[in-house]
């Protein structure tokens, strides 16, 4: 149909690296978007890398709010273009906090954490904390969210500042292998990027 979005479900479960689009007999297409789960074929075992990078296969599992900016943005490489290129939640007037759960690209032992509030000057979170867990069995996203309340602290609640990178060492779970990260922001606000560096195992 003209001037329309067309969605098609694909049942093929194979892994692909290239896509070829054929049109019959001719004509114009504005955009093509292929949605799916990334499968990283490279073996990162023994290497120190950003375990929360989308380039290596990290993915957001759930968050409680993404009113002004999508959660997946904070896994992107490089510096955010603007506030809209980060994760930002709506203003909270209560005592609640906002959170985001990330499945790491690989399981690993965490060495360093970086929270980047680039572009967020009057709407960055006052504080944040990070929890982590190692989940080897396949469970639902809902179960992960419920269980995350009991995850161990990877980073105690720390103060954040506007428009800068915050670097923290892992002093709480040095010898613990993890593959899920939960970032809690107090009470709300925006974060441009999160980078969790660790040795993949």
Predicted features and spans:
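Trp- and acidic/polar-enriched beta-sheet ligand-binding modules for extracellular glycan
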Residues: 1-99, 108-109, 118-201
């Amino acid at each position: 149909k003209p001037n329309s979005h067309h969605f098609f479900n694909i049942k093929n479960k194979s892994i692909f690296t290239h896509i070829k689009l054929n049109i019959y007999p001719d004509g114009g297409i504005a955009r093509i978007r292929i949605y799916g789960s990334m499968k990283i074929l490279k073996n990162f075992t023994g290497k120190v890398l950003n375990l929360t990078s989308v380039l290596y296969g990290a993915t957001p599992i759930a968050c409680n709010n993404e009113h002004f900016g999508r959660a997946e943005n904070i896994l992107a490489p490089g510096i955010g273009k603007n506030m809209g290129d980060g994760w930002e939640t709506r203003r909270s007037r209560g005592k609640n906090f906002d959170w985001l759960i990330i499945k790491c690209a690989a399981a690993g032992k965490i060495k360093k954490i970086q929270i980047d509030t680039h572009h967020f000057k009057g709407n960055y979170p006052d504080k944040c904390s990070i929890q982590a867990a190692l989940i080897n069995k396949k469970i639902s996203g809902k179960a992960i969210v419920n269980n995350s309340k009991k995850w161990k602290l990877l980073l105690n609640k720390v103060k954040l500042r506007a428009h800068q990178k915050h670097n923290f060492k892992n002093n709480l779970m040095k010898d613990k292998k993890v593959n899920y990260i939960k970032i809690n922001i107090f009470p709300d606000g925006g974060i441009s990027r999160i980078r969790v560096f660790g040795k993949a195992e």
